[in-house]
Amino acid sequence: MNAPGTAPMDTTPFRARRARLLQRMQAAGGGVAILPTAPERVRNRDAHYAYRHDSYFYYLSAFREPEAVVVLVAGKETKQILFCREKNEEREIWDGYRWGPEAARAAFGFDEAWTIGDLEKRLPDYLADQPLLWTSLGYDNDWDAKVLGALNAVRDKARTGLTPPHSVRDLRAELDEMRLVKDASELATMRQAARISAAAHCRAMRATRPGRHEYEIEAELLHAFRAAGSQAPAYTSIVAGGANACVLHYVDNDQRLNDGDLLLIDAGCELEGYASDITRTFPVSGRFTGAQRDVYQLVLDAQAAAVGATRAGNTFMAPHEAAVAVLAQGLIDLG
């Protein structure tokens, strides 16, 4: 855990992304962008699921707390605003450190920061006389209601000369375009996530033998992920022995591993919001049968063809088509 009052990482890339988004908004006519993080979810009674921030929100903010919203104003003068939870000594005793607006503004590089309770009051002021509203509607009914409430609050002041934005742009679509090209910090994080996951798969392979259970191998993966510093699995791990591997999203992971079967593992860690994803299949006993080896080699050849077709200038589908061609011919050859 980072010491209270210090940012969790270098926030320079996040500030640069906000500045780049503001430039794109200005080029499209200006306006205001509003982006909330993910809500907390109750697991049972007073227990919550482990919190995970919204990816789009984190991409711009580096801020991991729930109950937070980023507002970006792309006018003649740009403005970057963060709304977050207020400092609360009692809740921090229960739940841990909270940044609070003042410390968060300085640490994460925002021009202004306010408590999340101020959002409803201040949002109409940011929206007034702006040409465009950049947000994403249709994903969360509660959030949609807050946005519509703010727009209606501006409309209610029409007699004073204020006007609301005349149209809404999909903010996620704009951010998707930005996220297609990774910056240096993203690439470094993704490579480290891949290294952690590759080492976890090797650990799982070494631990596999007939008589063990799928969940025991899953535990090896989870141990390796967390011990290397990742925050969580990127998705529920698939550890599927024998026929279970034919279920595309098998997650029970509770069956015994048998001699002669293959074990499929589809698992990867998440590191600083970035996912890794690795799938490997290998013999439970450590040695392929003849038929298993033939099919394994065919899949490996298809993967090599796909990798070879992954290069600048090719279409998105080129790697897939290269793999399909190898698989189709290989299956014919195998009879």
PLM regions with names:
Residues 1-335:
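Active-site neighborhoods and metal-handling regions in enzymes and metal-associated proteins
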